[in-house]
């Protein structure tokens, strides 16, 4: 966003209205009017729309693993990388949350409060009915849970699939993220995924790694 005004408490960024404040503690040294800054917009503890150069663990629509830092009768607060913790309403928790524990949650925009919040109950947001991915396509994966045959994973925060134990050579835990690709889609839209890159890209990457190792070891 473009800087439109410099004041003693920070700078104002252009939102085509009155401007959004970026507090002084987040303003990069030497920032001036006309500069473009990469920021995240959210409501602070006083319900003001505010900007920050801090980057959260996720944005609206993302499914991420976050730690609980405090619990109240109304819900729990989780650390997501910003000064203001993200709130998980009691009604959006599965079995309750505990300080110090980590939980897999989906970040969403609460339509009533217009604030960013998080929920453990995100299964309804995941569907394979209409797929937005195809075979051999590169995707982002989040490990959801273990099954008898492999890891049940979330694909691009939208779909679900299975990463078979035989296709992965390291131990994974719920919340782990990795890049992969669509190995197979069945007629009923069940998806198998593989870690890494597909086909030629995978071979090229492995070849480059081997050449790099040979170079480091003088060809041996």
What are these regions (language model features)?
Residues 1-220:
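Single-stranded RNA-binding regions, centering on S1/OB-family and related RNA-binding modules
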């Amino acid at each position: 966003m473009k800087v439109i005004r410099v004041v003693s408490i920070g700078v104002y960024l252009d939102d085509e209205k009155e401007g959004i404040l970026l507090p002084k503690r987040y303003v990069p040294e030497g920032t001036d009017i006309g500069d473009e800054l990469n920021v995240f917009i959210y409501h602070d503890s006083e319900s003001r729309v505010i900007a920050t150069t801090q980057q959260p663990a996720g944005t609206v629509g993302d499914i991420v693993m976050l730690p609980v830092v405090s619990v109240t009768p109304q819900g729990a607060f989780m650390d997501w990388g910003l000064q203001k913790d993200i709130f998980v309403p009691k009604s959006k928790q599965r079995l309750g949350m505990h300080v110090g524990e980590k939980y897999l949650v989906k970040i969403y925009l609460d339509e009533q409060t217009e604030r960013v919040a998080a929920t453990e109950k995100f299964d309804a947001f995941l569907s394979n009915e209409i797929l937005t991915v195809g075979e051999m396509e590169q995707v982002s994966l989040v490990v959801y849970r273990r099954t008898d045959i492999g890891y049940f994973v979330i694909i691009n925060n939208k779909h679900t699939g299975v990463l078979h134990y035989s296709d992965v050579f390291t131990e994974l835990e719920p919340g782990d993220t990795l890049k992969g690709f669509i190995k197979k889609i069945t007629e009923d839209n069940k998806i198998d995924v593989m870690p890494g890159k597909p086909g030629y890209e995978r071979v090229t990457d492995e070849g480059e790694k081997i050449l790099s190792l040979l170079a480091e070891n003088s060809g041996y």
